[in-house]
Amino acid sequence: MDSITQIVLGAACGEAVLGKKIGNKALLFGAIGGTIPDLDVFIGQFLYGNEIQAMAFHRGFMHSLLFAVLGCFLFGWLTYHLYNTGKRLGTTTLKNWILLFFWSIFTHPILDSFTPYGTQLFAPFSDYRVAFNNISVADP
């Protein structure tokens, strides 16, 4: 799925979870969360010497349901401690941030699974790519 769609969906998740507490900043944090799984493109290029292995790494573990669960705690905890300082102290809870990152990260691989390329939703337990193949993707 294209990055714009993932950013907008992540922003919508951020607004739904924290919009009333932190306003438009929730859109930004949700958009960041919505793009986190696609950082595997850069990680794959760093880890592997050739482009084929790097592309095979894409839509792997960082697009799995397990990563959504683990990642939401990591990014939620980190953001909670960085955001809740000074005047903003006490405006949000750790649970708010974990939920924001869970929904923004979780929706990313679900949306990607509707494309013909598929997504390894069950990685690292299975390398099967779930692909519903009902949204066409036009890659430039």
How would you label these PLM feature ranges?
Residues M1-P140:
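N-terminal membrane-targeting hydrophobic helices
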